[in-house]
């Protein structure tokens, strides 16, 4: 899914400055917004062409997280949050979820686990086994999002077949303590730099709409840009009941689109993915994410909430005259051009789940 963020840019394409970004981030209506979207789309086409990549995930371990990230229903600290709670699923189920995502058009597949980090050797071993099987049995590019990681652990995962590591900054440094207090911004940077040092492709973004200012959205983008990440997943807050941020009002579709466009102009070479919250925040304007500069999005369900049916996501891409980008693993891709409908997807997903554990408060 992701190429290096140092991709050579076409003539005439240069990143905009932070000062210009802070001006443009306020262009959220009328001709100013239209011009901003046109500019972002032109950069996307010039650098990335007309291909869109899809990413699928599995929530491999859910709930009971000791962190206090204010947006997340998986925290054990929040009374009333109702995320599912279960231990690490088996490698076989992870691989089956990857097969489903691949058939739905996913280029990359990410193994996501709740918690500060993997707490047990057995969990790491399960992910290693799953990665080996993903490389052997599917065409998808394996990714993992497992919290804070050290170099030895990341090396084991890379040796097992990991291609991408995902770890979000979540928000600007100046706003981070308003969102999370149980780990630091710098701890997140350490994980990202460790992954980069091993040559893994980096996926790091965050969530917009968590009470930050427009200027802090630009600050966040500057920090992501300076890390030299390959992929920037952009989420929009979908407030979850029982969390500290549940009271926040969704930002407008125009604010979402302006932020995406500014991010594209700041980071022309990065792959920008629109992920969680697009249905809630953009509604019937979801198709405009590509005009705003995105060249990737998610297919299937999110961690703790349902996404669109895969055929609707693929249809959204095709309506814009865009095509799906296949994996770069050199293996035959299982996607045949026909993503499953909602009914088909739900029927295939109705498989036995691990027995839920009691929530620990």
From Swiss-Prot:
GO MF assignments: 2 iron, 2 sulfur cluster binding; 4 iron, 4 sulfur cluster binding; biotin synthase activity; iron ion binding
Organism: Anaeromyxobacter sp. (strain K)
Region entry Disordered, spans: 323-361
GO biological process: biotin biosynthetic process
EC numbers for this chain: 2.8.1.6
CDD domains linked: Radical_SAM
SUPFAM superfamilies registered for this protein in UniProt: Radical SAM enzymes
Family membership: Belongs to the radical SAM superfamily. Biotin synthase family.
Needed cofactors: [4Fe-4S] cluster; [2Fe-2S] cluster
Broad EC category: transferase
Oligomer status and interactors: Homodimer.
Pathway assigned in UniProt: Cofactor biosynthesis; biotin biosynthesis; biotin from 7,8-diaminononanoate: step 2/2
PANTHER family given in the database record: BIOTIN SYNTHASE, BIOTIN SYNTHASE, MITOCHONDRIAL
Residues where [2Fe-2S] cluster binds: 110, 143, 203
Basic and acidic residues bias locations: 339-354
Cofactor note: Binds 1 [4Fe-4S] cluster. The cluster is coordinated with 3 cysteines and an exchangeable S-adenosyl-L-methionine. Binds 1 [2Fe-2S] cluster. The cluster is coordinated with 3 cysteines and 1 arginine.
Name this protein carries in UniProt: Biotin synthase
Residue stretches making up the Radical SAM core domain: 47-278
Domain of life according to the entry: Bacteria
Catalytic activity annotation: (4R,5S)-dethiobiotin + (sulfur carrier)-SH + 2 reduced [2Fe-2S]-[ferredoxin] + 2 S-adenosyl-L-methionine = (sulfur carrier)-H + biotin + 2 5'-deoxyadenosine + 2 L-methionine + 2 oxidized [2Fe-2S]-[ferredoxin]
InterPro entries on file: Aldolase_TIM (IPR013785), BATS_dom (IPR010722), Biotin_synth/BioAB (IPR002684), Biotin_synthase (IPR024177), Elp3/MiaA/NifB-like_rSAM (IPR006638), rSAM (IPR007197)
Positions of [4Fe-4S] cluster binding: 65, 69, 72
Function comment: Catalyzes the conversion of dethiobiotin (DTB) to biotin by the insertion of a sulfur atom into dethiobiotin via a radical-based mechanism.
